[in-house]
Design a protein with these regions (language model features):
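A composition/biophysics-driven feature that prefers long, compositionally simple stretches
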Residues: 1-223, 227
């Protein structure tokens, strides 16, 4: 029954989960990102990650087949002040699923830093957000090394336009789409069903079943559903 409930909302089996996650990301990029950039007053956003040391925001902006940065991965977003449309760019290599959501702007022979500098010249933004924050660890994912490399690579005029992007990244994280809300309701129902079973006499044997047994039963059910 749990599998049927998840399958009805596209959250089971694992292949369906992948399709669903891509659709959720597509919706967020199209619905939430333009609003977040406008509301925060930024017309450019750079999200920089390094292999084995990802910015926490990075995983919320990429597809299921590219959950971790490759060498140096840079995502760039430019909001057109006239149309409100956001150009989504991937600097460096990207996965097949990413091809449908991001423009690959790398030119032959360019390094990621040369490419980033060129994009900034093309877009000429007035306010550039990077993930630095005094208040939120989740919005403070830009490493000191990458920040120095970025400043060294771009033109001096753009260095002066870089600002801490907490106002943008918080808005990106906090706003959910209708599809996300629907899936949350599904997961909530499944969670209650798991609790109802593991706390019932269908599973618990008085005097024998321990709280640890209940914990492992919950983990097993969740794992069998393709989650962890």
């Amino acid at each position: 029954k749990l599998k049927d409930r998840l399958a009805a909302d596209g959250a089971y089996p694992i292949q369906a989960q992948a399709v669903l996650s891509t659709q959720i990301l597509k919706d967020k990029l199209e619905l939430v990102l333009p609003w977040a950039m406008e509301a925060s007053g930024f017309d450019f956003w750079l999200v920089l990650s390094r292999e084995n040391n990802d910015d926490p925001i990075h995983s919320t902006l990429v597809t299921w087949d590219m959950l971790e940065a490759r060498r140096v991965s840079i995502l760039a977003f430019h909001r057109d002040s006239k149309t409100g449309a956001v150009r989504r760019m991937c600097v460096g290599s990207q996965s097949p699923e990413m091809d449908g959501l991001y423009e690959n702007v790398q030119q032959r022979g360019e390094s990621v830093w040369e490419e980033t500098a060129r994009i900034l010249r093309e877009c000429d933004p007035s306010r550039i957000a990077v993930n630095r924050s005094l208040n939120s660890g989740y919005c403070d994912g830009l490493t000191a090394t990458l920040f120095e490399q970025l400043k060294d690579a771009i033109d001096p005029c753009y260095r002066e336009r870089i600002e801490d992007g907490e106002a943008l990244s918080v808005r990106w994280l906090e706003r959910v789409t209708p599809l996300e809300k629907k899936i949350m309701e599904c997961f909530c129902a499944v969670t209650h069903a798991i609790i109802d079973y593991t706390f019932s006499t269908d599973f618990i044997i008085p005097g024998k079943t321990t709280t640890t047994d209940i914990e492992w039963c919950m983990r097993r059910i969740i794992n069998e559903l393709g989650y962890n």
